[in-house]
Amino acid sequence: MAGSRRLAHFFMASCLFLCYTASVNGGKRGNSDKCSYKQGTQTSSMDEGARKLGVTFRYDNCSVNWSPLGKHAIHEVNNISFSHLSCDSQAAVVVHWMASPLGIEHVKGFRVYLEDKNPERKQCQHLILKDPRQLNFSYKTIRMSSQPFSSLAFETDYMVRIVPFPTFLNDSFFPPSFLRTNSCEVLLGPDNLVCKPFWKPKMLNVSQLGSNLHVVFDHAPSTFGFSIYYLYYKLRQEGPFRLKRCKPEQNGPKTTCVLQDVTPGTYAIELRDDSNNTRRQTQYHVSQVHSPWAGPIRAMAITVPLVIMSAFATLFTVMCRKKQQENIYSHLDEESSESSSQTTALSADRPWPRPKIFICYSSRDGAKHLAVIQSFAFFLQDFCGCEVSLDLWEHLEICKEGQMSWLSRRIDEAHFIITVCSKGLKHFVEKRHRKGKATSKEKNREPSASDSSSSSRDLFIVASAIISEKLKEVHQKSSDLSRFMSVYFDYSHETDVPTSLSLAPKFKLMDQLPQLFARLHSRQLSLTDREPQPPNVSKRNYFCSKSGRSLYVAIYNMHQHVTQEPDWLEKELMPPPLPNKRTIPEKVDSGLVLNEVKLKHGSESECPPVRSNVLILPQTPQVGVSLSLSREDLGEGSSSQDAGSCRPVLHTDGSASPPEMPRDSGIYDSSVPSSELSIPLMDGLSPDHADNSSLADSVSSSSGLGDEEPPAVSSLHCTAHTICKADLHHQHLHPSEGLIAAAST
């Protein structure tokens, strides 16, 4: 009984073994049928020896059973060769090699790598010795083979690396081998359709019929099995293609595909098959279809309504913009008149007290900066209710008292001292400070005639030095520096504040206008009552008044000037070009020779209200006049003006230059660009200037902004007339032909 059971178990095991062997052999036969050798593959007689010795491998996954560490050194393999196959209409390769006798007894298996230029398509085979489990020296001539590497491209280069294991050597120690797969014709045959995927039609004709395109092409051979053709078309400047599917006509060798309602233009047309392998492309220009109604009548019917509509639209736009501008400016004018009337009423009801303000500024930053200063002073006086002291408005007072006396008195009387800091002010103040010329002796002395233009233009440097000294004194005694203020406009920077004035509070205008206004009206004055504050003082509404609007335009013009000319200060510092000197030739037959003319500056007591001096010469054809000016007698002051001197302008034709007439300018005309706007008449000066500063008022009120240059106010720096003496060295001059000096008062 027990024997029969053992016999049954033996038969069952035998059946299972036979079934497993049959299935394995069937799988191997299937792989053999799937990947077949072609002509040109490499063979070797060593395969028979390998089968006799019974060398078989167990194939495993590379990523699972990989232990790279070993204790012995195994040398690289020898005699690497390749066999080319075809698997599923693709190229395949089998790798062959021989083990090296050095370290062959330690080999447990091999790893075979195959990769192309793309590292992501790397293939690997892990071969473990199955029978025998260990090699010896007699296996050195046995050729070993890998499984086929399939899914390879035709005529492509690959790299193969064979690494025996286990070993302590890295994979890079074993040198690679290179191979190139065979072509499709060699592996599959020249008649195989896989080797000819790029069939192109011999004919691709395009014609236009109305607004349709007719595309005609021939069919591919029936062996390709194309069931449908794809026609892609698009305008050349468009992005993606549009698709038209065309079924081949069974009755003929050609097929016509119609593209309906195409717009005029140049089209790119491409024919493809259903596998997207067959392509042929062409271009065709679709012309405009002319209808019977096309022509001049159609053009006029389209153009005339468009022109009429455009004209109405333009007229409507212009009228709307004009109306909008009128509303804006009328609103501004109403607010301006209300503000002016309110300020006038406040001044009439409570004319005193008004904070006295002294403004120190740089007179060397150009005419546009001077326009900003005058507008700012007028704004403080008109809108902010302050009494402003500005040298441009008090030329007569300066002539009477002298520059230093007037400067000291105005600084002492002022409740607030405002320094308008700019790029030029910092440059000249710190330049004078570095040179050490701003000494107390130079500050306290009266300017002489030889200082003329430089001392007059550098008055702000002396004023800055005095303000700096007073600021230091107040800072040492107490911390209340509210009397001193350093302001700068948006075309300047905080770094433009000189170091000597850094202790004073700083304000950026017009961003910090409310803080400045509060500072001007918050100081507790020694007077009984104070003037009410104008409401709603801010950066957004200060230009509602005339003075604020003038200040806004002046700041805008200066800001535009700084933006367009970043090196504007360097241009202002450049010396003016020398005028061309023209000498009057001396006539030999003249009876009168005027050798020299000396200009004598009178004292303050000898200063009648003289406006100009005129030198009149008789115009006789027989008498010639030679005029020579002594540069040593005139000195540097003869070419400029001073607080106590004036100079007549004598032209080469012998006539005196008339005084430059002040120019008046408009206020915010809606038809004038913003860059050409000007300051309005500054008629809101304080009452103390009405009786003795009428001339200064006219000068300040006629100062233009924008692109206009202000009038030369330096011509008013005069309180003393000039006495001209002529030495006559000829005795035959008739009394009626003498020199006539006329002084106009």
From Swiss-Prot:
GO terms for cellular component: membrane. The chain crosses the membrane at residues 299-319. Residues 354-518 form the SEFIR domain. The keyword Acyltransferase does not apply. InterPro entries: IL-17_rcpt-like, IL17R_D_N, SEFIR_dom. GO terms for molecular function: interleukin-17 receptor activity. Pfam families: IL17R_D_N (PF16742), SEFIR (PF08357). Residues 439-448 have a biased composition (Basic and acidic residues). The keyword Transmembrane applies. Residues 27-298 are extracellular. Residues 1-26 form the signal peptide. It is a single-pass type I membrane protein. PANTHER family: INTERLEUKIN-17 RECEPTOR, INTERLEUKIN-17 RECEPTOR D. This is Interleukin-17 receptor D. It comes from Danio rerio (Zebrafish). The gene is il17rd.
